[in-house]
Amino acid sequence: MANQKQTTHFGFKSVDWNEKEKKVAEVFHSVAKNYDRMNDLMSLGIHHLWKRYTIELSHVRPGQSVLDLAGGSGDLTRLLSQKVGNSGQVILADINAAMLHVGRDRLLDEGLFKNIRYVQGNAQCLPFADNSFHCITMGFGLRNVTDKDEALQSMYRVCKPGGKLMVLEFSTPVFPGLKPVYDWYSFNILPKIGKFVANDEASYQYLAESIRMHPDQETLKAMIERVGFEDCHYHNLSGGIVALHIAYKY
């Protein structure tokens, strides 16, 4: 699909199709060491609640195989590893080596290693066999993917029949009056926090822009259904600032 499209967006900028992946990699290489601290500051810690809610609705059971895609620093992987137990397995996959190392080191420091594997891989061409996973989670990663349709197709391929996809991502506020306040915070406060804490204003400017450019709830629902997933629905969290999409492969 990529060779059919000449340009895409990197935040608000139009870039060559093959350039976006490189630019996103540079962003996450830059933010990796401060990723957890910045998440806590930017969301006032609420991102932990969003992630716990995702795990609660996953209904993952002992012995199952789970893919935590764009798993980054390992928040979802940690919780999932507790659910699947020693008889199951969680694969933390991320395209970015720096983020993967942060997640691996963090989880190893917490003594979590028996049921976790780490794989560097691209969501658009996942290096796993067909029908491999009972559940696939992707937390705050889809908006950074160059070809979202191709990535969703790849997720569908590796999901087991009867399995579940869960996409947790920034979305479009639905409460009246919330969107302008959220936009003001995103474009005026987030980059300044990035500059102060991580000395990296540009990466957090991209974060704000990438959120604005990401498909809204209904558009993403249609994209997920288009690749073959069924019974797709979503939960608006914090007034739609974040949405959790859940869908099934039958």
Curated annotation (Swiss-Prot):
Enzyme class, spelled out: transferase
Any Pfam family matching the protein: Ubie_methyltran
Lipoprotein among keywords: no
GO biological process: aerobic respiration; menaquinone biosynthetic process; methylation
A molecular-function term among this protein's GO annotations: demethylmenaquinone methyltransferase activity
Keywords: Menaquinone biosynthesis, Methyltransferase, S-adenosyl-L-methionine, Transferase, Ubiquinone biosynthesis
Family matches, as PROSITE patterns: SAM_MT_UBIE, UBIE_1, UBIE_2
Domain of life of the native organism: Bacteria
SUPFAM superfamilies: S-adenosyl-L-methionine-dependent methyltransferases
Reaction it catalyzes: a 2-demethylmenaquinol + S-adenosyl-L-methionine = a menaquinol + S-adenosyl-L-homocysteine + H(+); a 2-methoxy-6-(all-trans-polyprenyl)benzene-1,4-diol + S-adenosyl-L-methionine = a 5-methoxy-2-methyl-3-(all-trans-polyprenyl)benzene-1,4-diol + S-adenosyl-L-homocysteine + H(+)
Residues that bind S-adenosyl-L-methionine: 73, 94, 122-123
Gene3D superfamilies the UniProt entry points to: Vaccinia Virus protein VP39
E.C. code: 2.1.1.163, 2.1.1.201
Pathway: Quinol/quinone metabolism; menaquinone biosynthesis; menaquinol from 1,4-dihydroxy-2-naphthoate: step 2/2; Cofactor biosynthesis; ubiquinone biosynthesis
InterPro entries per record: SAM-dependent_MTases_sf, UbiE/COQ5_MeTrFase, UbiE/COQ5_MeTrFase_CS
Family: Belongs to the class I-like SAM-binding methyltransferase superfamily. MenG/UbiE family.
Function text: Methyltransferase required for the conversion of demethylmenaquinol (DMKH2) to menaquinol (MKH2) and the conversion of 2-polyprenyl-6-methoxy-1,4-benzoquinol (DDMQH2) to 2-polyprenyl-3-methyl-6-methoxy-1,4-benzoquinol (DMQH2).
Protein name: Ubiquinone/menaquinone biosynthesis C-methyltransferase UbiE
